[in-house]
């Protein structure tokens, strides 16, 4: 009996992590699902530049080249744009919706990655869970 209780105690942080991720996905999805455009350039034109980079990759451009000038280096690290472009292609989304919905995927991935990183560092699931929520 005591072994079962200890086993359940070890699973509670994982269950709470899943609940945290589900709540975060629900809040984030409801926040962005009604967007008709990316947030205003007043927050920075980075969103629109990234959308151009993603369009460039989706149209067959090399992710390791600049999307804005021939022979130039990319203005940003290309991993985000490449992953987002492939996400858009996989789900047949337009680029703007792909950027918005890919943020939900990134939230899920980073929450899990942070949890396992903090679990290894602190060797405690509860501390890892708290750190994920604070991160």
Swiss-Prot record:
Domain of life: Archaea
GO cellular-component term (any): plasma membrane
Primary location class: membrane
Keyword annotations: Cell membrane, Membrane, Transmembrane, Transmembrane helix
Subcellular location: Cell membrane
Membrane topology reported for the UniProt record: Multi-pass membrane protein
TM stretches of this protein: 12-32, 68-88, 98-118
Name of this protein: Uncharacterized protein MJ1080
Originating species: Methanocaldococcus jannaschii (strain ATCC 43067 / DSM 2661 / JAL-1 / JCM 10045 / NBRC 100440) (Methanococcus jannaschii)
Record lineage: Archaea, Methanobacteriati, Methanobacteriota, Methanomada group, Methanococci
């Amino acid at each position: 009996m005591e072994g079962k209780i200890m086993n359940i105690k070890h699973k509670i942080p994982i269950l709470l992590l899943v609940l945290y991720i589900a709540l975060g996905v629900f809040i984030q999805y409801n926040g962005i699902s009604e967007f008709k455009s990316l947030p205003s350039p007043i927050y920075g034109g980075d969103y629109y530049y990234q959308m151009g980079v993603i369009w460039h990759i989706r149209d067959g451009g090399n992710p390791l080249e600049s999307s804005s000038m021939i022979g130039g280096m990319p203005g940003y690290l290309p991993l985000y744009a490449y992953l987002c472009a492939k996400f858009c292609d996989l789900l047949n989304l337009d680029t703007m919706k792909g950027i918005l919905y890919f943020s939900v995927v990134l939230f899920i991935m980073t929450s899990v990655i942070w949890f396992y990183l903090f679990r290894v560092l602190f060797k405690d699931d509860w501390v890892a869970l708290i750190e994920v929520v604070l991160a």
